[in-house]
């Protein structure tokens, strides 16, 4: 029989509250705690949660890829992976046109081309920074 895994989504209005929810989820023996990009950065609560938990997986559902350059996103993900001892799950995603153009003040482009560039930056050869 397949094991049923149950995750929890953090909903607290503060990063401390989200980290505390992740600790509560672990105490309830949930499989993972997820943050999302709404009222705060999705990575910061997970950094706190990584220090307050020891077994639950921690992930972003989602971090908006368009709002970050690939290098800073990769470094944040790597740091969280190390801080959590391998429990971090990076969930990247796109947003709809109004969010991209209004909330982030970025030009709109077709998501497929941006996703391809993002995927190459994460799955391709090591990134290098010049300049």
Regions inferred by a protein language model and the residue ranges of each:
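N-terminal beta1-alpha1-beta2 module of alpha/beta enzyme domains
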Residues: 1-60
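Flexible, glycine-rich active-site loops centered on histidine and acidic residues
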Residues: 2-11, 70-131
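Feature marks short, surface-exposed loop/turn motifs that line or immediately flank catalytic pockets
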Residues: 39, 66, 96-98
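Glycine-rich "substrate-gating" loop/helix at the edge of Rossmann-like oxidoreductase active sites
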Residues: 36, 63-69, 107
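Alpha-helix-loop-beta-strand connector modules within alpha/beta enzyme cores
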Residues: 43-63, 67, 114-127
